[in-house]
Amino acid sequence: MLRVIIGEIPPLSTPQAVARWLSPALRAQQPSGKRQASWLAGRVMLAWAVGTRGLPPLETDPHGKPFLPHRPELAFNLSHSDGVVALTLSDAGAVGCDIERIRPRRSWPSLARAIFSEEEQAMLSALPEEARLPAFWQCWTRREALLKQRGAAVWELLQAPAILTPPEGVFLSDCRVEDLQIAVCACVPCKDIGKRLESLTLASL
């Protein structure tokens, strides 16, 4: 089983959704400030995906990756960007996901030169100018998904291998939905994730 779910953060972080899906103990752990809404929305989405109202606090394994204490056989990963949240859930080993809203970023050419492999940089350079920014986000999300599946830190983007061809033993897939770029990395084949996408709305809760 491999599920990929996306949703808007505001409706998934309402007081009603939070009270229904998150336990008091988990709600007590919520951060304050600008991270709060995305934190709540991600956990509401996770609770809905596993069918657990009153989701208990998550625990962490020896490598620092969170897991569900009542469903330890399920691996999951959350990502958020500019008002949207994504969840990948699997019962077949570790997963990683990344979602980014395709948007201008003044420093993206220098980031690509610093982080991407020569192969990736050559691919970007060969594209028409208008296609380079979306391709940058495609490479970026694939790298993030790979590193998150491995449990690596974001700074290790600099050390990740080229991701045009995934490393042996893992599978990478990505898709674009309107202005969103989504990538998933899993231990099992995950091609055509665009066809797997589920959308979680307030009405579904």
Predicted regions: what they are:
Residues 1-205:
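Core catalytic alpha/beta fold that binds nucleotide/phospho-ligands
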